[in-house]
UniProtKB/Swiss-Prot annotation:
Location within or outside the cell: Plastid, Chloroplast thylakoid membrane
Segments passing through the bilayer: 5-25
Membrane protein topology class: Single-pass membrane protein
Organism: Chlamydomonas reinhardtii
SUPFAM superfamilies (alphabetical): PetG subunit of the cytochrome b6f complex
Gene Ontology CC terms, in alphabetical order: chloroplast thylakoid membrane; cytochrome b6f complex
GO biological processes: cytochrome complex assembly; photosynthesis
Protein name, entry field: Cytochrome b6-f complex subunit 5
InterPro entries: Cyt_6/f_cplx_su5, Cyt_6/f_cplx_su5_sf
GO molecular function: electron transporter, transferring electrons within cytochrome b6/f complex of photosystem II activity
Keywords (A to Z) from UniProt: Chloroplast, Electron transport, Membrane, Photosynthesis, Plastid, Thylakoid, Transmembrane, Transmembrane helix, Transport
HAMAP family for the chain: Cytb6_f_PetG
Length: 37
């Protein structure tokens, strides 16, 4: 009973976490790029 719920939570959190890290890295890249020039 617990495993499907756990799989659903993991499958829900993983894309959000990856998207959050990607957005954060992209914003830091833009900020660094603007600061460089």
């Amino acid at each position: 009973m617990v495993e499907p719920l756990l799989c659903g939570i993991v499958l829900g959190l993983v894309p959000v976490t990856i998207a959050g890290l990607f957005v954060t890295a992209y914003l830091q890249y833009l900020r660094g790029d603007l600061a460089t020039y």
